[in-house]
Structures are given as structure tokens and as C-alpha cells.
């Protein structure tokens, strides 16, 4: 069974009802990953998700509701960063010309065993070692 890693923006759209078409597409993707048991995230994604859902979307969720969402998603395969991951991300910022936080996402995805990363922010179709990026909103 292959693992698929989700970047924060995709998971946010799954719970942001004001995102219209992106909400529907992201929701379908997240639901499929739930049913298949193939979803992977990082601690960074869970942290960013909570902040975004409670502070940055047009209709912010309450902290208790966002906490429940984070707790539910924490049952997926979640990668916690290690010092080695930080060093690998630093190297990736140099080698791949990425921001540090994007590099941390890719390092976590690689460590999760994922070969596919769902993201709106990174370059769809681009590969980084064993991981390929895909934009769920560009495919529709």
C-alpha cells in the first residue's frame, strides 16, 4: 500500500467551506485517503492546520472544533521531525532552492514512505528524489 502525503494547504481546503470548488476537491481527496488508510502528514502540517483553521480562513473555526480535526488527522501516519530531518531540509534549501518549510514538508514526506505529495504551493509534476508533487486542483 502506497502512502500519499498532504501539504497543509490541501488539508485546510478540505475543512474550509468558503473555498468552494477547492473545498469539494480537497474533501474528496482527504476522504479517499481516510478510507484507504494511505494518508500521511507531518507534525508541521498539523500545527499549521490548527493556526490556519482558527485564524486565517474567511470563516475561522473555533479552537475546540479545530482541535478535534487535528486529533482525528493525528491518527494518520504522522512524521515528527528529527534533528536529521532539519539538516536534510537545510541541504534541500541549497540543492533544490526551496524555502526551509517547504523542504521540511518534502523531507517528512520522504521519511513517511510517500512517493506522492499533494500540494497547491509547490511545483506540480516536479520530483525531489523519491517524491513527486501533484496539485489536486490543477487536475480538475
Give the ranges of each region predicted by the language model:
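Short, well-structured N-terminal submotif of metal-dependent ribonuclease cores
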Residues: 1-41, 56-64, 140
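Acidic, PIN/NYN-like endoribonuclease modules and their adjacent C-terminal/linker elements
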Residues: 3, 106-140
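Acidic active-site catalytic centers that drive phospho-/nucleotidyl reactions
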Residues: 7-9, 48, 102, 121
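Alpha-helix C-capping/helix-to-loop hinge sites
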Residues: 14, 32-36, 52-56, 72-77, ...
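Amphipathic alpha-helical interaction segments
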Residues: 28, 44, 48, 68, ...
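Short beta-strand segments at enzyme active-site cores
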Residues: 41-43, 118
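Glycine/small-residue-rich phosphate/adenosyl-binding loop
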Residues: 46, 50, 58-71
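Active-site neighborhoods of divalent-metal-dependent phosphate/nucleic-acid chemistry enzymes
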Residues: 76-120
Amino acid at each position: 500500500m502506497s502512502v500519499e502525503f498532504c501539504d497543509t494547504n490541501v488539508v485546510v481546503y478540505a475543512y474550509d467551506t468558503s473555498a468552494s470548488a477547492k473545498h469539494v476537491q480537497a474533501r474528496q481527496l482527504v476522504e479517499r485517503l481516510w478510507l484507504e488508510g494511505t494518508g500521511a502528514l507531518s507534525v508541521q502540517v498539523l500545527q499549521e492546520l490548527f493556526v490556519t483553521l482558527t485564524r486565517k480562513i474567511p470563516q475561522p473555526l473555533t479552537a475546540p472544533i479545530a482541535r478535534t480535526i487535528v486529533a482525528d488527522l493525528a491518527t494518520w501516519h504522522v512524521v515528527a521531525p528529527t534533528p536529521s530531518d532539519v539538516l536534510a531540509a537545510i541541504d534541500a534549501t541549497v540543492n533544490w532552492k526551496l524555502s526551509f518549510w517547504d523542504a521540511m514538508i518534502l523531507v517528512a514526506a520522504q521519511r513517511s514512505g510517500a512517493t506522492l505529495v499533494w500540494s497547491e504551493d509547490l511545483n506540480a509534476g516536479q520530483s525531489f528524489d523519491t517524491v513527486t508533487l501533484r496539485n489536486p486542483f490543477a487536475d480538475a
